[in-house]
């Protein structure tokens, strides 16, 4: 699963997600992509589950790019622990996603195979997404 090799600080504030994505909103690698329509956190497990579903559907042909990286640590306190005594330990990592962000890109396959694979990936993700083509975005 994806997670940072080293971080400057172990723990992070929760943060806010106002507005839409400015960075990562253009398709740079593939022909077909998956674009987020709402803000949210996507865990490294969800990113990996969607990637596996896509690669199994595509079988041999094509290439897939993951355009998001889970770099935000999420902490959790142990069960039945009293309040106070500091923040809990890091449990997992998430990628912060805003509307308009491209999550995955694909190329080297027919449109039917690409849309089928991206539909499988949509089912694995906790945010609403839409399938986009490079030709549609470059208007």
Curated annotation (Swiss-Prot):
Keywords carried by this UniProt record: Ribonucleoprotein, Ribosomal protein, RNA-binding, rRNA-binding, tRNA-binding
InterPro entries noted in UniProt: Ribosomal_uL16 (IPR047873), Ribosomal_uL16_bact-type (IPR000114), Ribosomal_uL16_CS (IPR020798), Ribosomal_uL16_dom (IPR016180), Ribosomal_uL16_sf (IPR036920)
GO cellular component term, pick one: cytosolic large ribosomal subunit
Region (Disordered): 1-23
Domain of life: Bacteria
Comp. bias regions, Basic residues: 7-16
Keyword Ribonucleoprotein assigned: yes
GO molecular function: rRNA binding; structural constituent of ribosome; tRNA binding
Cited PROSITE patterns: RIBOSOMAL_L16_1
GO terms of biological process kind: translation
Family from the record: Belongs to the universal ribosomal protein uL16 family.
Physiological role: Binds 23S rRNA and is also seen to make contacts with the A and possibly P site tRNAs.
NCBIfam families: rplP_bact
PANTHER family cross-referenced by the UniProt entry: 50S/60S RIBOSOMAL PROTEIN L16, LARGE RIBOSOMAL SUBUNIT PROTEIN UL16M
Subunit-level organization: Part of the 50S ribosomal subunit.
Protein name as annotated: Large ribosomal subunit protein uL16
Organism listed in the record: Myxococcus xanthus (strain DK1622)
Gene: rplP
């Amino acid at each position: 699963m994806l997670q940072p090799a080293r971080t400057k600080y172990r723990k992070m504030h929760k943060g806010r997600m106002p507005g839409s994505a400015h960075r990562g909103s253009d398709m740079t690698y593939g022909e077909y992509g998956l674009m987020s329509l709402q803000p949210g956190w996507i865990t490294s497990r969800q990113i990996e589950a969607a990637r596996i579903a896509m690669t199994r559907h595509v079988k041999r042909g094509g290439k897939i790019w993951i355009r998001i990286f889970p770099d935000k640590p999420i902490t959790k306190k142990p069960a039945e622990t009293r309040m106070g005594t500091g923040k809990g330990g890091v449990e997992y990592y998430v990628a912060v996603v805003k509307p308009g962000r491209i999550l995955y890109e694909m190329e080297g396959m027919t449109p039917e195979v690409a849309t089928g694979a991206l539909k499988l990936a949509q089912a694995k993700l906790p945010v609403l997404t839409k399938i986009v083509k490079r030709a549609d975005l470059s208007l």
